[in-house]
Regions:
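Short helix/loop segments within enzyme catalytic domains
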Residues: 21-75, 162-166, 256-317
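Post-HEXXH active-site segment of zinc metalloproteases
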Residues: 230-261, 302-305
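Catalytic Zn2+-binding segment of zinc metalloproteases
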Residues: 205, 210-214, 223-239, 296
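PDZ-domain C-terminal substructure recognizer with occasional recognition of PDZ-binding tails
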Residues: 144-183, 258
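Conserved PDZ fold ligand-binding element
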Residues: 117-141
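C-terminal motif of bacterial Sec signal peptides marking the signal peptidase cleavage site
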Residues: 14-17
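PDZ/PDZ-like peptide-tail recognition elements
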Residues: 46-106, 171-173, 177-188
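Active-site-proximal gating segments in proteases and membrane effectors
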Residues: 71-85, 187-190, 242-245, 268, ...
Length: 370
C-alpha cells in the first residue's frame, strides 16, 4: 500500500515538472466571450459571402446545361432567404446580428446576378412574406422555397415582400436548370466531390480559384461526373471485378482454402478504379464545355491546375486516380482551343462524345479530389 502511495506521489511530481512554466496574463471570461462572438459573426458572414459566389456560378452552370441533366431538372429563381430559426442551433444566438436577419420574416441574404429574382427586382435585405399567396415559413425556409418551385415549375411567382417597412408585390419568372444541389462545405483543403445526389465544393476551392471562370471549371467538372454516369459505370466495373474475384475465391474454397473474400474484395476495388483517370479527364473535358455554355471565358482558367500543384505537389507527378496537374493544364488548353474554334465557326457547344450520355446513377459512391 505504501509503495502504491509513493508511486502516485512520484507521478504527480513528474506531471508537475512537465507543466508550462511561464507566467501568462489572465484572460477575462467576458473578454473571451466577446472575442468569440466577433469571430463567430465574422465566420458566418464570410461563409455566406463565399456561398453567394458559389451559388452565382452554380446557378449559371445548372441553367445553361439543363439538357444534359435530362429529366433531373427543376425550376429555380436564384435567391437565398433565411431566418435565425432556419439555421442550425449553434448559429441562432448571433446569426441575426451577423446577417441582419429578422425573426418574424425570412430575409433575403443572397440574390444571384442575372437570375429571375434579380430581374424581378428582389434585393438583398428584402423580407419575404408570401409566394402566390402562400406564407413563406420562418423555419426550413430554403427547403420550403425549393419545394414550392419544384411544384410550381416555370409558372410566374407573385412575391409579396417588405422593403424598408413598405410592402411590395413583384412577379418572378423561374427558369429550369439541373436539379442537383451544389453545396459549400467548410474545409480548407481545396477539393470538390460529387455523387448522384449532390455536389460538394470545399471552401478551400474558393480560396485558390482566382476567377469565377476557374471556379466554373470545377463546378462543371463535378457536374460532368454526374451527367456522364461515371458513378454508375464505376459501380458496374466493380461488380464485374467482384464477380471474377468470387469465382477465384470459390475455386480456392473447393480446394479447402478459405480466402475470406480476398480476391472478391480486391478485384471489386480494382474494377472500380479501372478507368478512374480516364473518367477524370472526361469530366475536365465536359466541364470546360459546361462552363463556356454558362457564359464564362475559360481562356487562361487552366491556371487553376498550376495553383493546385502548389497545394498538392504530388499531383505534379503521380496519377493513381487522377491525371497529373501538368496533363490537366495542357488538356484544358487544347479543349479551350477546340471550343474557341467551334465558337468561331458557329457550331453547337457540345462535347464530342463517343456514345450518348448516361443517366445519372443511383449509387452513392463519390468522385473525390476533382
Amino acid at each position: 500500500m505504501r509503495g502504491r502511495r509513493w508511486w502516485v506521489i512520484a507521478s504527480v511530481w513528474l506531471c508537475a515538472a512537465c507543466a508550462p512554466s511561464t507566467n501568462l496574463p489572465t484572460l477575462s471570461p467576458d473578454d473571451v466571450a466577446a472575442e468569440r462572438r466577433k469571430q463567430e459573426i465574422a465566420q458566418l458572414r464570410d461563409y455566406y459571402e463565399q456561398l453567394h459566389r458559389l451559388d452565382t456560378v452554380a446557378f449559371r452552370i445548372r441553367a445553361a446545361n439543363r439538357e444534359f441533366c435530362k429529366d433531373w431538372v427543376s425550376a429555380q429563381i436564384g435567391l437565398l432567404a433565411l431566418t435565425p430559426q432556419s439555421l442550425p442551433r449553434k448559429y441562432k444566438s448571433f446569426s441575426a446580428e451577423a446577417l441582419d436577419l429578422r425573426w418574424v420574416r425570412p430575409t433575403v441574404v443572397s440574390v444571384v446576378d442575372g437570375s429571375p429574382a434579380a430581374a424581378a427586382g428582389i434585393l438583398k435585405g428584402d423580407e419575404l412574406m408570401s409566394f402566390n399567396g402562400e406564407p413563406v415559413p420562418v423555419t426550413g425556409t430554403p427547403g420550403w422555397i425549393g419545394g414550392f418551385l419544384r411544384y410550381n415549375g416555370e409558372r410566374p411567382v407573385t412575391v409579396i415582400l417588405q422593403r424598408d417597412g413598405v410592402e411590395q408585390k413583384l412577379v418572378v419568372n423561374p427558369v429550369v436548370g439541373c436539379a442537383i444541389p451544389i453545396d459549400l462545405e467548410i474545409n480548407a483543403d481545396p477539393n470538390a466531390a460529387a455523387d448522384p445526389r449532390k455536389i460538394i465544393v470545399q471552401s478551400g476551392i474558393l480560396r485558390i480559384t482566382k476567377t469565377d471562370a476557374e471556379l466554373a471549371l470545377i463546378v462543371g467538372h463535378e457536374l460532368g461526373h454526374v451527367t456522364m454516369g461515371h458513378h454508375q459505370k464505376k459501380t458496374i466495373n466493380g461488380l464485374i471485378g467482384e464477380f471474377g474475384g468470387t469465382m477465384i475465391d470459390s475455386g480456392f474454397l473447393l480446394g479447402g482454402i478459405y480466402t475470406g473474400r480476398a480476391f472478391s474484395n480486391y478485384l471489386e476495388r480494382a474494377g472500380m478504379m479501372a478507368f478512374s483517370v480516364g473518367f477524370e479527364r472526361e469530366a475536365d473535358y465536359v466541364g470546360a464545355y459546361y462552363a463556356t455554355r454558362a457564359g464564362y471565358d475559360i481562356s487562361g482558367a487552366e491556371n487553376v491546375w498550376r495553383t493546385m500543384a502548389l497545394e498538392h505537389p504530388d499531383s505534379i507527378r503521380l496519377a493513381k486516380t487522377h491525371p497529373t496537374s501538368p496533363e490537366r493544364f495542357l488538356l484544358l488548353q487544347k479543349v479551350t482551343a477546340e471550343i474557341t474554334d467551334k465558337q468561331r465557326r458557329g457550331l453547337p457547344l457540345v462535347p464530342e462524345l463517343k456514345m450518348s450520355q448516361a443517366q445519372p446513377a443511383t449509387t452513392t459512391a463519390r468522385e473525390d479530389n476533382f
